[in-house]
Amino acid sequence: MSMVYANIFMAFVVSLMGMLVYRSHLMSSLLCLEGMMLSLFVMMSVTILNNHFTLANMAPIILLVFAACEAALGLSLLVMVSNTYGTDYVQNLNLLQC
């Protein structure tokens, strides 16, 4: 495994560990999710460029589209929770059920 792949994998693991450690705050969880998506995007792009996968050129862009949708939904949920309760705790999400 080259150093590029090792660094990208390490970034993914650090984001995953941050997700496990800072799971009580919604903003921290969203930032860790974005870090995971960014490392997956870079890993996919580097793999496609190194192996010359011509059929998979659109896969990283599709991943970015899903990451943007996830970020928009997460931020709207963060705004709704912080306006309703004044904090960004994940435990407040259970109170939003109908």
Curated annotation (Swiss-Prot):
Keyword Electron transport: yes
Membrane topology: Multi-pass membrane protein
The keyword Lyase is assigned to this record: no
Database matches in InterPro entries: NADH_UbQ_OxRdtase_chain4L/K (IPR001133), NUOK/Mnh_C1-like (IPR039428)
Gene Ontology CC entries for this record: mitochondrial inner membrane; respiratory chain complex I
Enzyme class: translocase
Transmembrane segments: 1-21, 29-49, 61-81
Keywords: Electron transport, Membrane, Mitochondrion, Mitochondrion inner membrane, NAD, Respiratory chain, Translocase, Transmembrane, Transmembrane helix, Transport, Ubiquinone
Protein name according to UniProt: NADH-ubiquinone oxidoreductase chain 4L
Organism this protein belongs to: Odobenus rosmarus rosmarus (Atlantic walrus)
Lineage: Eukaryota, Metazoa, Chordata, Craniata, Vertebrata
